[in-house]
Amino acid sequence: MEDPEFADFWQLLGYHDVITPEIQRMALAAEVFWPCEIYYHAPADVRDGMIHALLSTEDFSEASNLMCCLAFQGDNRALEILLELERSPRPWRKRLYVDPSSYAQIGGWTFDKKGQKIQLNFDTCYPMVKGTTGEKSPVRIGRPREDTCPHCGGRMVDMLVLDGRDERLRFLGLDGVLTAACCPSCVGFLKGPAFNRFTLDGGVEVFPSELFDGAEKTDCYVRPEDYKALTENPFVLGKTPVPLFYGAACQDVNTIGGFANWVQDAEYTACPHCGKPMKYLAQIQWDTVFDCAEGTLYVEFCPDCHIVSMQHQQT
């Protein structure tokens, strides 16, 4: 991201949304397959060029990059090719860690065993911006709770409270309130994500969780002044949408919808009730809500089961 070429690319994509077919054709001709986001919704001729390269290569690293690019292109033909490679693996598959269906997730979608496409993100994105004192917002980050964490004894927090009835949030398909509650100290030390069930009237049922090391108790690393900063932060929902990749390359941007800035790999949680992959909803950068915090909290949800997952990533 420090290279000027990367900075220019992310300025064009994240803030101006102007990666054109001409740029995509030039990238393909130069065999530039990273960053893979450059091929988002590329035209059919570019897609076919990537498919030809993918089906011709014997190099696992090149195949990995090309599958990422094809995932961001994301049309039905891209799905057909990734499904074909999942069902009939090439020799280079043995050198990769995950199947083509997991590569598809990088582009915000995947497919099931029957080849049915599953959309994992939304085609609308809103930023969280700093508001004025007392400004009302349909989205709140960091609402205090009365209950305490069973692991560290610290205060639980509603990390995200979102009212889907606001006109800006209609794209989410939520006719009520979604609440995502967790322990801000322990969420990064759990064996898997934190989960809760939500009801559209604002209710929350926090699911049991386990620490990654199997211990029952741990220290609370969030200080009282951190809780205060978190629960009194000034963020409100922005008034207008932004490009889908607005938050995908910045470490200081909180967003609803669009694409995430995954610190590690894109990771879509399976719903603990129905088993389907959850949809990406929001990202909260910890250091935007209290000092000296690291990493990002990713919020996903299952629209059918009304279950939320919260997972932490950091370098």
Regions found by a protein language model. Give the residues of each.
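Preference for intrinsically disordered or flexible, low-complexity segments
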Residues: 1-315
